[in-house]
């Protein structure tokens, strides 16, 4: 099971992706899901790095290893909506995968004290 958690607490985004695609047909659906989860994670990290290079983040950290990705990002005031838009697009991708591969991926999270 792959777990995707996306949270926003007081304007600081936390994204955690963990696990592997487990299913009875690993040579087909498992590989497709795994590749899809990975490319969304890599895309997320790169688009946030691009925002960081443009001076749009107060803080950014990432961990990427086998079976786990963790990203923490705190935007500058002027880039809050840009960061949120990038994360929402990636979240939509994960939600589509959750519908396509029920029981193999779970997407969750919460937003606390979010300012827009």
Residue ranges and their predicted role:
Residues 1-32, 46-116:
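N-terminal intrinsically disordered, cationic/polar leader segments
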Residues 33-39:
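Gly/Ser/Thr-rich active-site loops/lids in small-molecule metabolic enzymes
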Residues 39, 43-47:
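Alpha-helical support elements that line or immediately flank enzyme active sites
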């Amino acid at each position: 099971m792959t777990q995707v958690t996306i949270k926003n607490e007081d304007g600081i985004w936390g994204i955690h992706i963990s696990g592997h695609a487990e299913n009875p047909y690993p040579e087909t659906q498992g590989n497709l899901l795994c590749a899809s989860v990975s490319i969304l994670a890599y895309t997320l990290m790169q688009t946030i790095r691009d925002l960081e290079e443009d001076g749009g983040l107060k803080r950014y950290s990432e961990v990427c290893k086998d079976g786990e990705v963790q990203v923490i990002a705190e935007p500058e005031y002027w880039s809050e909506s840009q960061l949120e838009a990038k994360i929402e697009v990636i979240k939509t991708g994960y939600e589509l995968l959750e519908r396509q591969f029920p029981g193999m991926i779970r997407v969750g999270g919460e937003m606390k004290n979010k300012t827009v």
